[in-house]
């Protein structure tokens, strides 16, 4: 399939006075998180919230800073995520891609907004037990509590 890149805009929502950064991010479907090189985290003045132990493709583990929040913008979509500070390029993992309802288009070698929901990102929310979707229009105070754990 080759490498697929996306032009993103990254910003620090805690510091709106800072300019956003335009970056070319590699879509990495093997990664869950947004990963940022250290110089990007410094430019955005992102606060380290904690350390995270990560396992990389070669099987080795390391502790890396977890920073955030980061506002990620792609076309008409935005999301707010934490990011791992590691590597030498921006990696767009599956969590922010799903949050913004983006799809990989191998034939176009690009990331695209889901054509089934072009104006508003779609999210599927399910009960943790069973496969029934939650109908939020039918939930009332008298409804059974939903166990999200």
Task: Tell what function each PLM region has.
Residues 1-141, 146-149:
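Pepsin/retropepsin-fold aspartyl endopeptidases
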């Amino acid at each position: 399939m080759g490498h697929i890149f996306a032009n993103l805009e990254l910003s620090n929502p805690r510091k709106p006075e800072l300019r956003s950064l335009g970056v070319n991010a590699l879509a990495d479907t093997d990664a869950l998180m947004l990963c940022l090189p250290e110089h990007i985290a410094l430019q955005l003045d992102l606060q380290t919230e904690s350390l995270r132990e990560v396992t990389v493709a070669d099987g080795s583990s390391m502790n890396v800073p977890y920073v955030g929040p980061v506002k990620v913008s792609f076309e008409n979509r935005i999301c707010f995520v934490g990011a791992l500070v590691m590597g030498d390029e921006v990696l767009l993992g599956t969590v922010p891609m799903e949050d913004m309802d983006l799809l990989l288009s191998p034939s176009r070698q690009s990331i695209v907004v889901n054509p089934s929901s072009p104006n508003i990102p779609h999210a599927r929310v399910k009960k943790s037990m069973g496969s029934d979707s939650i109908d939020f229009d039918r939930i009332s105070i008298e409804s059974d509590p939903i166990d999200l754990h």
